[in-house]
Amino acid sequence: MKNNWIDVLDESLVKDFYNNQTSEEQQEGLNTTLSFGTAGIRGKFGLGEGRLNKFTVSKVALGFAHYLTSSIAHPVVVIHYDTRHLSPEFAQIIANILASHDIKVYLADTYRTTPDLSFAVRYLQADAGVMITASHNPKDYNGIKVYGEDGAQLSTDASAQLSTYIDKLGHPLHINVPSLTTEQQSLIHSVPSEVREDYFKNVQDLVGTIPQSDLKVVFTSLHGTSVPIVPDILSSLNFNQFELVASQCEPDSDFSSVASANPEDHKAFDQSIELANLIDADLLIGTDPDADRLGIVERDAEGNIYYYNGNQIGALLLNYRIKQTEGLPNRIMFQSIVSGGLAKSLAQYHNVNFKEVLTGFKYIAAEIRHLSPEQNFIFGYEESYGFLARPFVRDKDAIQIVPLMIKYAAELKNEGRMLKDELEDITRNVGNFNDKLFSHTFEGTQGKAKIENIMTQFRSETPTEMCGLKVIAIEDFETGKKTDLQNDEVSDITLPKANVIKIYFNEGFIALRPSGTEPKIKLYVSLSCDHFDVIAQKINDAIFNS
């Protein structure tokens, strides 16, 4: 097939990316196949079935059209896209193919956030949504995420059904994409302005009034979609004591000012810190390119800088939501199985119901969907900096969290306190959990095999002791079994199966899982113990250097 792909290089939309790849990278694209998984599809630009290009995107769109029309008489779909290379082009391709199958499409007229998409699906009562994004991946990546009528990413079963429709189509170069009739072209509409207006109202209702204070905020969109929506929302809440990092708040598909447009990466805040030092700011906030995740940094009066990980931000936000919802009965919060122990302990301390779900915010969305009328959702989060305070969106939503965090910090500022002080109070009450994420990248087909080998070996050689910590239980989410080593009992795990292993100690847990969206395997360590950094590093070395 290689010659066929070379023949279409000029019309593939990815010529420059392909020409800049090594011969090994080019071959990988031609010899592999991108699959539509539980998190959609994500990959590098290039030629071949293993890359994103005009033809592979068209195949996904055509399979999606067949999937929708197989069960829905007159489907309606909302399509949004981020600031990445080819995001608008891919969105238009998908819109055209859906319209050619008589599917009504609402297509954003400019870049939009992922939470915007989730909200729009719900507001417009659409049957599905599509978000063109690769989150914080490098500049030569993009992706397609598909959402159901509830505004959440497709369930595992629905993703599998869609994947079947896509796979049935065969080779991307052999697919006939029909031209649009004039009538079909009229099926593509702009997203109405009232959608965003109603989203604003929901955020305003969540946040209420931000108190007058001396709080100064620095904000960066890391070249993504959260500007102008964040400044607009803050202004609508009468909060104007913020400065944008100008060099990072313009759309830039190359993410030129950062090595990684990821708010988990401390270096992503370097320019924010420079600006904060200039204007004597207190709170620094950054969102990832599609604005579903955010990170925060705090600066004290002496200019000292404090970074917060996802579990600490999650605990702070949960603490604030507990205060906000005081007196509300049957409160419940959700977090992923690899998120740390601090928020869980805080929920238990305040008698808030708590449940863990698989990694992936769609599992939190599914729990929200199935809540009884008597239950009151107050918070959901993943340690990877994804948070949700109120479920008018059914995915991670950095946009609703930004003003909420600012309000929290403003109230504390008026008390002469910082988020740092609040976190110290929380740990004093419920225990100090230290968290660390080790992320190992293994590219290509060899890397994929290495990740599989690491998981296989870890399963077959599960220890009874690690670095002086006694193993008390093991959960293997792939087999769906939990082994209690203290009582010598095996029980069923009630969550869906997933390629995750979690090992418990009296001091906390570790978890090992391959990423669903990147060529990485991740080790999560959450322990309440002395010499945490040393022990965490030893555990990492034992798994990856053995």
UniProtKB/Swiss-Prot annotation:
Is-annotated flag, keyword Magnesium? yes
User: What is the phylogenetic placement of the source species in the record?
Assistant: Bacteria, Bacillati, Bacillota, Bacilli, Bacillales
**Which keywords, in A-to-Z order, does the entry hold?**
Carbohydrate metabolism, Glucose metabolism, Isomerase, Magnesium, Metal-binding, Phosphoprotein
* Cofactor binding comment, as recorded: Binds 1 Mg(2+) ion per subunit.
| Name of this protein | Phosphoglucomutase
Gene name on record? Answer: pgcA
Sequence similarity: Belongs to the phosphohexose mutase family.
EC number annotated for this UniProt entry:
5.4.2.2
Q: Which CDD domains match?
A: PGM2
Which PANTHER family does the UniProt record give?
PHOSPHOGLUCOMUTASE 2B-RELATED, PHOSPHOMANNOMUTASE 45A
Active site, UniProt feature: 135
